[in-house]
Amino acid sequence: MAMKKLLIASLLFSSATVYGAEGFVVKDIHFEGLQRVAVGAALLSMPVRTGDTVNDEDISNTIRALFATGNFEDVRVLRDGDTLLVQVKERPTIASITFSGNKSVKDDMLKQNLEASGVRVGESLDRTTIADIEKGLEDFYYSVGKYSASVKAVVTPLPRNRVDLKLVFQEGVSAEIQQINIVGNHAFTTDELISHFQLRDEVPWWNVVGDRKYQKQKLAGDLETLRSYYLDRGYARFNIDSTQVSLTPDKKGIYVTVNITEGDQYKLSGVEVSGNLAGHSAEIEQLTKIEPGELYNGTKVTKMEDDIKKLLGRYGYAYPRVQSMPEINDADKTVKLRVNVDAGNRFYVRKIRFEGNDTSKDAVLRREMRQMEGAWLGSDLVDQGKERLNRLGFFETVDTDTQRVPGSPDQVDVVYKVKERNTGSFNFGIGYGTESGVSFQAGVQQDNWLGTGYAVGINGTKNDYQTYAELSVTNPYFTVDGVSLGGRLFYNDFQADDADLSDYTNKSYGTDVTLGFPINEYNSLRAGLGYVHNSLSNMQPQVAMWRYLYSMGEHPSTSDQDNSFKTDDFTFNYGWTFNKLDRGYFPTDGSRVNLTGKVTIPGSDNEYYKVTLDTATYVPIDDDHKWVVLGRTRWGYGDGLGGKEMPFYENFYAGGSSTVRGFQSNTIGPKAVYFPYSPNGYDPSNDYACATQDGAKDLCKSDDAVGGNAMAVASLEFITPTPFISDKYANSVRTSFFWDMGTVWDTNWDSSQYSGYPDYSDPSNIRMSAGIALQWMSPLGPLVFSYAQPFKKYDGDKAEQFQFNIGKTW
């Protein structure tokens, strides 16, 4: 048998040699073994055509060309007279790809890696590639500390030369760090140095960052942290000599040893700047000033380089190079910093483009730009455009990319890449409290109507005590200079008694128009006119309410429950907004201040003014803005003019999800004190606690909230990363722990006249609560959950520990 194979091989070789030396003209080309690959596709990949004279080299090139297509496992080329016979064995086609046992790596990520290697459903299977993928995946598991992991590719043949590919994972357990040793440290203790690491050999319960599970990438980051720690404290000669990672025999434990050389501390002796400064030497010199004898600090050096780049970027130098070279003098332990600057070319902006704005029109984004086309590139202007787009609240993310124009030495295109979020919402609110039970509200709002930037809203509330409807439209760019124009129509039918407030009914309707004027990047003013008609009825004889009516020249009856009163008021509305938040929703940095007010103008029945001030400040406490402290306040005050009081229905209220969580909405503050009356045998003592003042008329206390003409609310929140949520959804989910406090009081309450009752003019009756909140921009809409426990409250306050809102967005 062996002799037969040798004979056949010899005959084939001699045959090839014969036509290799003499060559022959190909009259026809035949294929054997083709199944999936078309004959035409195979012919196109071959260098030989019918009519060509071929030799041995041509045959070799043909075989190589067919193998290069990746479609064949075996290729043989034979001669049958004047016919070239090509025998192939096709690689099997991948019919399906499945995964089993992979917990640390998602299926989508595995599919992406396979596709990057050319392994996908419908393509031919290259077994050598599979072996590389197995090894690569195992190396990945090793890098995250799973040294017992294994990956096996299982190939199952199917009919018609197809296969099923299944990757079977056995991940094992992550090796835990048993000990981290630092050798060579004298200035700082090992514990002090390791306290800045992410990887730890011991993790206290309160440390949510530390991790005992070994990961190669985290170790690299920790070594860089160690290097920066020393360089920032003057150790300019610091060096990490070596790092050893040892594995225990059972592959479940890791020992890490870091060998370092600290060196001595060095002080900066000076900074020398050279190179192409593009005429900005004086400004660059200001950025490189140092204090005499200051310790060398690597972070400050890096910041100085970045500041120089930003400075040049503002003048159109898009790609400056700044390199700092420390010149170390070991004799006197000083460092002279030589900074070489090459500003490079100055660039114009050819075009500004937008990507990802499928709904928002280009004009809506372009009007927020401060960088102009055809002008010098200004990195600060580009950044301002990014900030303004973020503050619109239309986008989840905004990124910028400065791209060189091919073939041009001094032109760039600026590209803003946005990811749009749902700006329309249908909100359905639900609250539940131990005393209040269940309450509902609804509203429809579209902040980016048809991509035009218009804000259009139809909001309403329908429940046991209120029917409210509002239509509002705002054009943020009524003029090209950014003057906005907004209008509103509203109707409100309010039954106060059913809302646990002092009993009255108010049917009101009105309208207002407001113009907004931008002052600069962060400040704007508003001014407008409004009209409102109020029709009051069913007013029970309540002290604060009667006090207002008396100031209006009315003389309501304490024996008649059906007191009524109507007013028509015209108001001048004004406001100021300072907004330096980093984005429009879920901000992580910056401040916002909003002042709103109104005052009645001649022709009104009432005479009063009212002012509200809202502030919010976000302070990130880490570089990634995942941990943020939020402080919020709300202040309000109003009073009458010309001897009249501010209407009681304009009072401030507190309590609920937007002010002091844990309390029922609008129930914090003064409570109603009623004059007694007994129509139809009605006995007020059945509903209220009545008392007699010095033998005078009876007064009755209640738990009905009436609000006040002054309010102060504050909140401190600690925003944290949401557990079990990946970074992909970090911009859609927010968790926070909060402490709310607030009070409402009545500055016109005469405590001396009502000495037997609470002093509702006292602003020190502060309510407090603490709890946790979760906000989620879900596919169903914005969801807000909060649970709060009041820990400082007063008689008559009503708790509502759990509150949430749910809505739909589009």
From Swiss-Prot:
Q: Which domain of life is it from?
A: Bacteria
Q: Which Pfam families does the UniProt entry name for this protein?
A: Omp85 (PF01103), POTRA (PF07244)
Per the record, the similarity remark reads: Belongs to the BamA family.
Domain POTRA, by residue range, is 24-91, 92-172, 175-263, 266-344, 347-421
What's the source species for this entry?
Escherichia coli (strain SMS-3-5 / SECEC)
Q: How does it assemble?
A: Part of the Bam complex, which is composed of the outer membrane protein BamA, and four lipoproteins BamB, BamC, BamD and BamE.
Keywords from the UniProt entry: Cell outer membrane, Membrane, Repeat, Signal, Transmembrane, Transmembrane beta strand
GO (cellular component) term, any one: Bam protein complex
Q: What is this protein called?
A: Outer membrane protein assembly factor BamA
Q: Which InterPro entries does the UniProt record give? A: Bac_surfAg_D15 (IPR000184), BamA/TamA_POTRA (IPR010827), D15-like (IPR039910), OM_assembly_BamA (IPR023707), POTRA (IPR034746)
What PROSITE patterns would the database entry show? POTRA (PS51779)
The secretion signal range is: 1-20
Q: What is its main location?
A: membrane
Q: Where found?
A: Cell outer membrane
